[in-house]
Design a protein with these regions (language model features):
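Bacterial N-terminal signal peptides
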Residues: 3-14
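Flexible loop/hinge segments at secondary-structure junctions
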Residues: 19-306
Length: 306
C-alpha cells in the first residue's frame, strides 16, 4: 500500500501538468469586411472550445485595423491589404517595433458583371478608364456605354455603364486603387458599398453594371471576368490561377497582432491564432469561399508566431 501511495505521489506532477489550460477572457478584432465572416466563424469555434472566452468582431473596413491595434483597443487587426508605411510607422512610434502580419487565407480582387452580360474579359487599362478620373494607367477613351467596351449587340451597344465599388475604409478599395487605377483617383459617380456582398448583389440586380469585389463573394447572378495580363492572356480568377500567381490580383488576407520581438504572444491570442492556422481553421477558409494557405505558407506563419 505504501509503495502504491508513493507511486501515485510521484505521478502527481505529471498528471497536473497534463491538465488542459482553461482559457478565459475577451478577444477583440477590428478591420476588414472581407475577413468579417471568417473571423466570426473562427471566433464561434474558439468560444465553443473555450466557453470562458468572448470573441468580439468589428468589420468596418481594413483602414480601421491599424488605428485600433496601435491604440491597444483590440488584439487583432484584420486586413485585406498590407499595412501602409504611415500605418506601420504610427505603430512603431508607440511600441518601438513593427506589428506582426500573419497571413491566414488567400483571396483575390475580382471584376464582376451581370451574368447576362456577354463581355468575355477586361483589360486593366479599361478598368482604369472606367473607374478613375485621373487615368494614370494610360487609357485615353472613357467608356460610358457597353459598346465602348466592344459589345455591339443592339441591346448592349447603347446601354449606359453603371459602376459599383467599395468605400474608402475598405482594403479592397485600396487594393483596387493600387492595382487597377495605378494609384489614381476614383470617379465621383462610382456607387460605393460598405461590403463586397452588397456590391455583388447590386451587380446581380443591374444589367448595366460592373463592379469589383473579393473572390470570396462570388455569388449567383454575376460573372467573374478574366483579366488581361501584360502578355495578352485572359486569366480567369479560379483556385489554380490564384494559387499559382497567374491571376494578377491574388492577395493574402492578414491578421495583424502586437508581438514584441523575442517575446511570446499572450496565451489567449496565441491559442486563437494556432486554431486559425490549424487544419480545422483552414477548413473554415474553404467554407467561406476563400483559399486555404499552402503548407509552406502555414509553416511560415506558425514560425512567425514563435
Amino acid at each position: 500500500m505504501r509503495a502504491l501511495f508513493l507511486l501515485l505521489f510521484s505521478l502527481l506532477p505529471a498528471l497536473v501538468q497534463a491538465q488542459p489550460v482553461m482559457l478565459s477572457g475577451n478577444l477583440s478584432s477590428a478591420g476588414s469586411d472581407t475577413l468579417g465572416y471568417l473571423m466570426t466563424l473562427w471566433g464561434d469555434d474558439f468560444s465553443r472550445q473555450s466557453p470562458g472566452v468572448n470573441v468580439q468582431v468589428q468589420a468596418s473596413g481594413s483602414s480601421t485595423a491599424p488605428t485600433a491595434l496601435t491604440a491597444g483597443s483590440v488584439q487583432i487587426g484584420a486586413m485585406s491589404r498590407p499595412m501602409q508605411a504611415d500605418e506601420r510607422q504610427a505603430f512603431e512610434a508607440r511600441y518601438g517595433y513593427p506589428p506582426l502580419a500573419v497571413p491566414v487565407a488567400m483571396d483575390a480582387l475580382v471584376v464582376v458583371v451581370n451574368q447576362r452580360n456577354p463581355l468575355q474579359s477586361v483589360d486593366p487599362r479599361q478598368l482604369d478608364a472606367l473607374f478613375s478620373v485621373t487615368r494614370l494607367c494610360g487609357a485615353q477613351q472613357v467608356p460610358e456605354r457597353w459598346g465602348d467596351l466592344g459589345l455591339h449587340q443592339p441591346e448592349w451597344q447603347q446601354r449606359a455603364i453603371q459602376r459599383y465599388g467599395r468605400n474608402s475604409a475598405s482594403g479592397t478599395w485600396g487594393f483596387f486603387k493600387q492595382q487597377a487605377l495605378c494609384q489614381g483617383d476614383f470617379r465621383n459617380d462610382v456607387a460605393e458599398f460598405p461590403g463586397s456582398a452588397a456590391v455583388v448583389q447590386a451587380v446581380a440586380g443591374d444589367l448595366r453594371s460592373i463592379g469589383y469585389a473579393s473572390f470570396g463573394f462570388h455569388l449567383s447572378g454575376v460573372k467573374l471576368l478574366p483579366v488581361m495580363t501584360k502578355n495578352g492572356e485572359a486569366v480567369a480568377p479560379d483556385p489554380d490561377s490564384i494559387r499559382s500567381g497567374r491571376y494578377p490580383w491574388a492577395r493574402p488576407l492578414y491578421l495583424y497582432v502586437n508581438k514584441a520581438p523575442g517575446k511570446p504572444l499572450p496565451p489567449l491570442l496565441a491559442a486563437f491564432l494556432q486554431q486559425v492556422l490549424s487544419e480545422a481553421g483552414q477548413q473554415r477558409v474553404s467554407e467561406a469561399g476563400y483559399l486555404p494557405l499552402s503548407e509552406t505558407q502555414m509553416a511560415g506563419a506558425r514560425k512567425a508566431l514563435q
